[in-house]
Amino acid sequence: MAPPLSPVSKLLIGLIRGYQLVISPLLGPHCRFRPTCSQYGIEAIRRFGMLKGSWLTLKRVLKCHPLNPGGEDPVPPKNFDNREH
């Protein structure tokens, strides 16, 4: 079971949902990844919390550009550790 969300995490998820409902339909589908970057952000914040979830989301959004082919890029599992040893 996921830990309870902090108020800031809920706010960030609300902002992403607002983007999904208001801005994204105006821009049309252009995300190169599955799940979309906005859905990835919601999942990452829910899974890892505000700090790490936001960091993963930022890295994902920066990869979403015309030179990247995109494709499947799910949120890493909870035990994911990207630190280099």
Curated annotation (Swiss-Prot):
UniProt subcellular location: Cell inner membrane
Protein's name according to its UniProt entry: Putative membrane protein insertion efficiency factor
Function: Could be involved in insertion of integral membrane proteins into the membrane.
Membrane topology (UniProt): Peripheral membrane protein
InterPro entries linked: Membr_insert_effic_factor_YidD
HAMAP family: UPF0161_YidD
Similarity annotation: Belongs to the UPF0161 family.
Organismal lineage: Bacteria, Pseudomonadati, Pseudomonadota, Gammaproteobacteria, Enterobacterales
Species the sequence originates in: Sodalis glossinidius (strain morsitans)
Superkingdom assignment: Bacteria
UniProtKB keywords: Cell inner membrane, Cell membrane, Membrane
Primary location recorded for the protein, binned into one broad class: membrane
